[in-house]
């Protein structure tokens, strides 16, 4: 399993981002995110919906933050687009669809969410040569 250097979630607004930060902190504390992994939650700029492409460009600009290509050299970065209103699943709107619980547990019996399965799956993909 390959670990990521930076794990980034996108959020539609600051209120959603606060909830995502709490979810990520819990996962770090409970061993679901490997130690040393930098986690970030980045909101759509100006509180306006920008879509996946706009969110990706915003994330790349914030990661580069004046450092240019050096910010990306030799690093594995996962961008998980997770902003949204959960209109079809209102019961999970507060924590976001990406943190919807799934009927399985982690290695130490921790409850898992969709995010945890996404992270496990993409971490198993080989790193580029």
Where in this protein do the model-derived segments appear?
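Unchanged
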Residues: 1-129
């Amino acid at each position: 399993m390959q670990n990521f250097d930076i794990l980034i979630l996108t959020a539609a607004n600051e209120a959603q981002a606060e909830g995502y930060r709490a979810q990520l902190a819990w996962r770090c504390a409970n061993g679901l995110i490997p130690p040393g992994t930098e986690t970030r939650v980045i909101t759509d700029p100006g509180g306006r919906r920008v879509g996946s492409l706009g969110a990706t460009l915003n994330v790349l600009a914030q990661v580069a933050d004046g450092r240019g290509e050096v910010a990306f050299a030799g690093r594995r970065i996962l961008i998980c687009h997770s902003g949204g209103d959960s209109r079809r699943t209102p019961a999970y709107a507060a924590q976001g669809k990406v943190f919807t619980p799934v009927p399985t547990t982690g290695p130490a019996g921790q409850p898992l969410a969709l995010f945890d399965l996404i992270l496990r799956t993409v971490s198993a993909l080989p790193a580029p040569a």
